[in-house]
Structure formats: structure tokens, C-alpha cells
Amino acid sequence: MKRTFQPKNLKRKRTHGFRARMRTQGGRAIINRRRAKGRKRLTA
């Protein structure tokens, strides 16, 4: 049976990367929450 997760770095960056997050208001909110929490890595 084929697994559902077939990792691809480009797709990962495009979907969950910093620039993708900054593109939308909700994405910027995610980054701000993660900054407030003190996350070492903000995005994928």
C-alpha cells in the first residue's frame, strides 16, 4: 500500500514556508503567535 506522505522539500516550503505564511493575514498571525511563544523555528 502506498503511503500518503511523500516528502518534497519544495512543496513543503511553498505551503508552510516563511514567505507563504507572510502572504496572508492568518499566516502572519501564526508567525506572531510562534514568536510570542518563543519558538526557535517559526516555519518549516
Curated annotation (Swiss-Prot):
Ribonucleoprotein among keywords: yes
One GO cellular component term: ribonucleoprotein complex
UniProt KW keywords: Ribonucleoprotein, Ribosomal protein
Molecular functions (GO terms): structural constituent of ribosome
PANTHER family: LARGE RIBOSOMAL SUBUNIT PROTEIN BL34M, MITOCHONDRIAL RIBOSOMAL PROTEIN 34 FAMILY MEMBER
Family in the record: Belongs to the bacterial ribosomal protein bL34 family.
Keyword Cell membrane among UniProt keywords: no
InterPro entries membership: Ribosomal_bL34, Ribosomal_bL34_CS
Entry-linked HAMAP family: Ribosomal_bL34
Name of this chain's protein: Large ribosomal subunit protein bL34
Gene Ontology biological-process annotations: translation
Pfam families given in the database record: Ribosomal_L34 (PF00468)
Gene: rpmH
Organism of this sequence: Nitrosococcus oceani (strain ATCC 19707 / BCRC 17464 / JCM 30415 / NCIMB 11848 / C-107)
